[in-house]
């Protein structure tokens, strides 16, 4: 199913916020 999660910041992986956690919720789909 799909669930919302918050991106963790890694160099070169936007979106990022202040080098910590991001405030952009993103929906991802995972199998099972």
From Swiss-Prot:
Q: How would you summarize where this protein is expressed among tissues?
A: Expressed by the venom gland.
What intrachain disulfides are recorded? 2-17, 9-22, 16-29
Q: Which GO terms describe its cellular component?
A: extracellular region
Keyword vocabulary terms for this entry: Amidation, Disulfide bond, Ion channel impairing toxin, Knottin, Secreted, Toxin
- Could you tell me which residues carry Aspartic acid 1-amide? 31
Sorted alphabetically, which InterPro entries does this protein's record hold? Huwentoxin-1
Post-translational note: Amidated as well as non-amidated forms are found in the venom.
What is the protein's major site of localization? secreted
List the molecular function annotations (GO) for this entry. Answer: ion channel inhibitor activity; toxin activity
Q: Where in the cell is it found?
A: Secreted
Q: Per the record, what about its domains? A: The presence of a 'disulfide through disulfide knot' structurally defines this protein as a knottin.
Q: What does this protein do?
A: Probable ion channel inhibitor.
Give the family from UniProt: Belongs to the neurotoxin 10 (Hwtx-1) family. 30 (Jztx-14) subfamily.
What is this protein's name? Answer: Jingzhaotoxin F4-32.60
Q: Which organism is it from?
A: Chilobrachys guangxiensis
